Amino acid sequence: MTKVAIIGAGPCGLSALRSFEQAEKNGEKIPEIVCFDKQEDWGGLWNYSWRTGSDQYGDPVPNSMYRYLWSNGPKECLEFADYSFDEHFGKPIPSFPPREVLYNYILGRVKKGNLKSKIKFNTTVTNVSYDNENFEVTYRDKKNDKISKDIFDYVIVSTGHFSVPFIPEYPGMKAFPGRIMHSHDFRDAEEFRGKNVVVLGSSYSAEDVALQCHKYGAKSVTIGYRHNPMGFKWPEGMKEVFHLDRLEGNKAIFKDGHVQETDAVILCTGYLHHFPFMSEDLKLKTGNRLYPPMLYKGVVWQNNHKLMYLGMQDQFHTFNMFDCQAWFARDVIMGKIKTPNDSEIEKDINKWVSMEEKLENADQMIDFQTEYTKELHELSDYPKIDFELIRKTFKEWEHHKVENIMTYRNKSFASPVTGSVGPIHHTPWEEAMDDSLKTFLNK
């Protein structure tokens, strides 16, 4: 029997497991599936941990979630086509839920089946190599410190790319008397109440960590950008300045001449695509971009069609895009989709990369990824979902942020699956200090 290894049981890995489960429910004979995950439970990044640094077994903690995290994009844009929010919660819910609510939704879909039995938890994959038409996967049982090997016909890498932080060095860091941390280790904005905070970065992490610090009482928040400012209308106590040059004592000196006394520096400087367990000839090497190179349809490894990577893109679309990728990967593995010859694959990859290189703004990026996801959707039997409505919702969301970065989470949108419109949340985001599922749903 064909054997498939799935590495990671976060959203991408769960999409892969779900895709095979659905095929089996449809009466198809599926391969033997083994999923590996280094954590104690499923959910990937959404499985919040208080830990930073190392876990109890000495491995790096993969989690980057923090307390009081609320979705920074409309939930409707990530809705599963085969499992709506309405079905899970029994009613429409507001469009911007906190982490616990989304985690509950993610698990609700996979708990319906017997998927957990296919996952080896507390298991770290240490090496994947390919020879004689097969993959050899070496893995370590962390609890028992036992090394094992197994042979697979296909490998799906679904580890994500938001767990290994990129940490730059600036002059003066060693002598800085305050707190320096990467957003990967950020857990609680309450730590910075009454303090002056410098946040370095200009993408979603910088935006949200800065807003969290402001919301929970930071004295001031100064955001340092390298290339282009986010440019939002920040509330009093927040500002953007150009590029940190150095730290001198407790002062942050920026290249535009701005000087800011600070108690803490939070590096929101992104993450690395990091696959130390993959042999060199199988390893994806890319920055954070909408169409990584070497991946046919953004999924199949160009040099070995038995290897797939899920969720490696910079992302507007998330969960339903991961599903479309997983359904596509499944159908390649099960022979329902035939990969073309090398020349056609090269041509297809170059087409998407060329289009990506011409993108100039967020609206164009949304269009690009929507068209990519729609194309994948049409290639499999993934259930119907309104990607045109998702496109429209993304663009409205972007414009709401430009209008008011503090209130965009108070808007509501329609589901691309059921059409129901989420109610306005009972408490404006800026005033909502309790992020529990119970309070969110029932107050």
UniProtKB/Swiss-Prot annotation:
- Superkingdom of source: Bacteria
The protein's name is Trimethylamine monooxygenase
Instruction: Identify its protein family.
Output: Belongs to the FMO family.
* Record Pfam families: FMO-like
Q: Which InterPro entries match?
A: FAD/NAD-bd_sf, Flavin_mOase, Flavin_mOase-like, FMO-like
Gene symbol of the encoding locus? tmm
Span of the signal peptide: none
Cystine pairs annotated here are none
**Per its Swiss-Prot or TrEMBL entry, what cofactor is needed?**
FAD
Where, in this chain's numbering, is NADP(+) bound? W70, N72, Y170, S202, S203, S205, R226, R409
EC annotation from Swiss-Prot or TrEMBL: 1.14.13.148
Respond yes or no to whether keyword Isomerase is given for this record.
no
Keywords of this protein's UniProt record, alphabetized?
FAD, Flavoprotein, Monooxygenase, NADP, Oxidoreductase
Which reactions appear under catalytic activity for this entry? trimethylamine + NADPH + O2 = trimethylamine N-oxide + NADP(+) + H2O
Organism annotation = Pelagibacter ubique (strain HTCC1002)
Function according to Swiss-Prot or TrEMBL: Catalyzes the oxidation of trimethylamine (TMA) to produce trimethylamine N-oxide (TMAO). In vitro, has a broad substrate specificity, oxidizing many nitrogen- and sulfur-containing compounds, including dimethylamine (DMA), dimethylsulfide (DMS) and dimethylsulfoxide (DMSO).
Listed binding positions for FAD are D37, Q39, L45, W46, N72, V125, Q315, T318
Give the molecular function GO annotations: flavin adenine dinucleotide binding; N,N-dimethylaniline monooxygenase activity; NADP binding
